[in-house]
Amino acid sequence: MMAGHPNESTPHSLRNIGFTIHMGGRDKAYNRNAVAATWGKQLDSLQKADPDGYQHLVKIYPDKGHWMDRLDAAAVPWMAKFRRNLHPKRIVWKQDDVTHSRFYWLAVDSLNRKARSTIIASRNGQTIRIPTSNIKQLTIRLDDQMLDLDQPVRIQSATGMLHQAVVPRTLAALARTLEERGDPNGMFAAEVTVVWPDAA
């Protein structure tokens, strides 16, 4: 919603983080006030459909312009109650026109970084479900906080089993994810790549 932004982004990937918008109701430049209100409605709708996600606070101050007389400072204590979760049970990853190679415990190579693609993944015990994907190939990254890496891991699509075997811990996975993130807490010990045979 900043000046000059085309405002075509969507909030779908915000499922696992707290997100807040504070906007002056009279801040009409670049249609910021209307876009902020629209995002509020979109986030309300997403949270209604998925109550465990999309924690948000959208405040439109009707009589304020771009300067909100510091009313937007309320965002700081609200955001402070959230903590990063590197291993959410459910992920909604919607790529924008600027694409990325990784998101939480999912990763794609350069051939599968498709603008506007959406991946929804969830995990429960030793099973990971990815009901739909409009990419051909996806890497799932794992560690011992997520599941038991000494036991077989099942990865299912809507049409069948994509993987069912033990996923070994490797130094390569640890090194790659440490290099990417620069964060020891963000390392993953194992990874497996699955392919959708029927993907476009």
Identify the role of each PLM range.
Residues 13, 18-23, 56-60:
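Structural recognition of the beta-strand scaffold that forms the well-ordered cores
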Residues 20-30, 62-63, 132-134:
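Conserved strand-to-loop "acid loop" that flanks and positions the catalytic carboxylate
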Residues 40-200:
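Alpha/beta-hydrolase-fold serine-hydrolase catalytic core, especially in secreted/extracellular enzymes
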Residues 28-38:
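Conserved alpha/beta-hydrolase "acid-adjacent" motif
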Residues 6, 23-27, 86:
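Surface cap/lid and interfacial helix-loop subdomains adjacent to catalytic sites
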Residues 1-12, 16-17, 31-33, 48-49, ...:
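Mobile cap/lid helix-loop segments that gate and shape the active-site cleft of serine hydrolases
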